[in-house]
């Protein structure tokens, strides 16, 4: 029984690590992603594609609701990525 519980615990920890991509800053995220979210829960998210939610780029690289758009797209006044 102890072995089964240990295996389940290790499996759950491994799954949480795979799913969670928490970040503290842009440097924690891979290419094509930004660090976005609330002060307490930031995650690496992909840059916005055409028609997706976005936030304009800023010099501090701090984003709360979404990432900037992918290259060749711009974030419109309604916070959606569109062709530049």
UniProtKB/Swiss-Prot annotation:
The keyword Ribosomal protein does not apply. Its main location: secreted. It is found in: Secreted. It comes from the Eukaryota. Residues 1-21 form the signal peptide. Disulfide bonds join 23-35, 29-44, 34-67, 54-75, 69-81. It holds the Pfam family Prokineticin. Expressed by the venom gland. One of its GO terms (molecular function) is toxin activity. The keyword Lyase does not apply. InterPro entries: Prokineticin_domain. GO terms for cellular component: extracellular region. Belongs to the AVIT (prokineticin) family. This is U8-theraphotoxin-Hhn1c 2.
């Amino acid at each position: 029984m102890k072995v089964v519980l240990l295996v389940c615990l290790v499996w759950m920890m491994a799954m949480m690590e795979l799913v969670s991509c928490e970040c503290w800053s842009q440097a924690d995220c891979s290419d094509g992603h930004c660090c976005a979210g609330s002060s307490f829960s930031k995650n690496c998210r992909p840059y916005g594609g055409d028609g997706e939610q976005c936030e304009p780029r800023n010099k501090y690289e701090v984003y709360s609701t979404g990432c900037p758009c992918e290259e060749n797209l711009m974030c419109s006044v309604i916070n959606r990525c569109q062709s530049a």
